[in-house]
């Protein structure tokens, strides 16, 4: 069992049950899945870029990424419908908790000029989105092996009904949210 999964089961459930006033253990919010997405629009000109992006994503997540394709043609971006333009990975269960552990304790502290995560990035239904500008904050990525620095989007989907419940859940996992000053 992953370290954060055990922490959730032993500590977080009881904390949130008291704080949110949940009647049942099953009513306590939990993390459903984590989705990682890299959009590589520059891959239109060079197909090798997409292979490198998918390799980076596989090393970061520990899972083979799925190719994402353009839904419709956009002349301004010089892309056609159904062209490969990025990749994504959906993590659940044990792999999700292991990635979350690495994200909170290793990757986020390595972000340059980090002042905390924005508490405004919730979507209104308790899910959290964050963007990362550099994939080199993850220890799995070797700085000498990358061809370009790329960002990614990380979406944490929870069963929380409101942003306050979602934020309470992520704070219980020690997410470094920015405090209002």
Curated annotation (Swiss-Prot):
GO MF annotations, alphabetized: rRNA binding; structural constituent of ribosome; tRNA binding
GO biological process terms on file: translation
UniProt-listed Gene3D superfamilies: 3.30.1440.10
PROSITE patterns from the UniProt entry: RIBOSOMAL_L5
Cellular component annotations (GO), alphabetically ordered: ribonucleoprotein complex; ribosome
InterPro entries for the chain: Ribosomal_uL5, Ribosomal_uL5_bac-type, Ribosomal_uL5_C, Ribosomal_uL5_CS, Ribosomal_uL5_dom_sf, Ribosomal_uL5_N
Keywords per UniProt: Ribonucleoprotein, Ribosomal protein, RNA-binding, rRNA-binding, tRNA-binding
A Pfam short name: Ribosomal_L5
Subunit text: Part of the 50S ribosomal subunit; part of the 5S rRNA/L5/L18/L25 subcomplex. Contacts the 5S rRNA and the P site tRNA. Forms a bridge to the 30S subunit in the 70S ribosome.
Cited function: This is one of the proteins that bind and probably mediate the attachment of the 5S RNA into the large ribosomal subunit, where it forms part of the central protuberance. In the 70S ribosome it contacts protein S13 of the 30S subunit (bridge B1b), connecting the 2 subunits; this bridge is implicated in subunit movement. Contacts the P site tRNA; the 5S rRNA and some of its associated proteins might help stabilize positioning of ribosome-bound tRNAs.
Sequence similarity: Belongs to the universal ribosomal protein uL5 family.
PANTHER family: 60S RIBOSOMAL PROTEIN L11-RELATED (PTHR11994)
Full protein name: Large ribosomal subunit protein uL5
Organism taxonomic ancestry: Bacteria, Pseudomonadati, Pseudomonadota, Gammaproteobacteria, Chromatiales
Gene: rplE
């Amino acid at each position: 069992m992953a370290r954060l999964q055990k922490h959730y089961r032993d500590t977080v459930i009881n904390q949130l049950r008291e704080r949110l006033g949940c009647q049942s253990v099953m009513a306590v919010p939990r993390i459903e899945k984590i989705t990682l997405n890299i959009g590589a629009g520059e891959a239109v000109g060079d197909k090798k870029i997409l292979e490198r992006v998918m390799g980076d994503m596989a090393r970061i997540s520990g899972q083979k990424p799925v190719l994402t394709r353009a839904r419709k043609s956009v002349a301004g971006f010089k892309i056609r419908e159904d062209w490969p333009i990025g990749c994504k990975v959906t993590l659940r269960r044990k792999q999700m908790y292991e990635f979350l552990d690495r994200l909170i304790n290793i990757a986020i502290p390595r972000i340059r000029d980090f002042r905390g995560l924005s508490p405004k990035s919730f979507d209104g239904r308790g899910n959290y989105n964050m963007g990362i500008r550099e994939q080199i904050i993850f220890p799995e990525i070797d700085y000498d092996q990358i061809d370009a620095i790329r960002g990614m989007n990380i979406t944490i989907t929870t069963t929380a009904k409101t942003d306050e419940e979602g934020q309470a859940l992520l704070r219980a996992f020690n997410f470094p949210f920015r405090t209002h000053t």
